[in-house]
Amino acid sequence: MEITDMPTDDSNNGIIDYVSTGHLPDPETVVKLVQEAHKRFSTDTAGVVSNVYPALERIPADLFGICMVGTNGKIHSAGDVDYEFTIMSVSKPFVFALVCQAIGAKTAREKLGVNSTGMAFNSVTAIERASDGRTNPMVNSGAIATTSLVPGATSDEQWKFIYDGLCRFAGRELTLNEEVYQSACETNFRNRGIANVLQGYGRLGCDPIIATDLYTRQCSLNVSARDLAVMGATLADGGVNPLTRERVVDNDICHYALAVMVTAGLYETSGDWLYDIGLPGKSGIGGGIVTVSPGKGGLGTFAPLLDSAGNSIKGQLAARFLSRSLGMDMFVSEPYTEKN
């Protein structure tokens, strides 16, 4: 029996599921450490602002915001947490979760794939290297395929499904950055090519032009570091938004969304991210990173200076510092002590 043939659901043959998630430190400690992270890394000038779209190039390079939202709804922040930027690829795990909710996690894996490609986020070769055209929902090819599976009889209905779902994750109505959207529509030749290749492999659920447009729109929504923290905390809280208390997706769906974030959330540097930080994360060229600590909360960061892989440098530094200092790293255990 292959592991992919195993049941993909939240039933464990009648056995009660237990989770080991712990909790965040007291609120005073959390806010102190968030402020310390901002102070430590705010002067770092490494990296470059994305030049993919003119609107991104104009973002002030010194902006930096950190927000931690616990599953209890408490918000701790420092810096430019309300500055709005385009969500870009950080939208991917949330749309994937919405699609899993709609069609089932097993079907989503069969249609999209979940393994890391080890290649750049916009690689066409990754599709062709896979014998069946499946990649990963966290890279562009897999994300476009994911978006194509959104339910709806028309593209308007599909967009409403995506938009409403992302707004529910954020707990507020999001706005579309028309300038970025129009610029992307005029220049997204590579994504159009990716969609056509996917169509050739039979991996799209709708017309490639529609799939590319829907994907472009979802990436052009404005969010803040605070929004990302709330969205991450919703995944951390089993699909329930900790501010609105609305259930966005089922508890088991969060497992699958976090799993693909671990495999490819920071593209070809996902291994380095996991090695250093030990948590599911997702980055975007707009400068945002969302980090999720299951059962504890979501961390949203914004800083537009990026490394060569398109990941926010300050965001990575802040996540590394806070994952350990707040006790969120999934791979760190309590130090062993001899017991009498």
UniProtKB/Swiss-Prot annotation:
GO terms for biological process: glutamate biosynthetic process; glutamine catabolic process. It catalyses: L-glutamine + H2O = L-glutamate + NH4(+). Keywords: Hydrolase. Substrate binds at residues 89, 140, 191, 215, 267. Its EC number is 3.5.1.2. It comes from Yersinia pestis. This is Glutaminase 2. One of its GO terms (molecular function) is glutaminase activity.
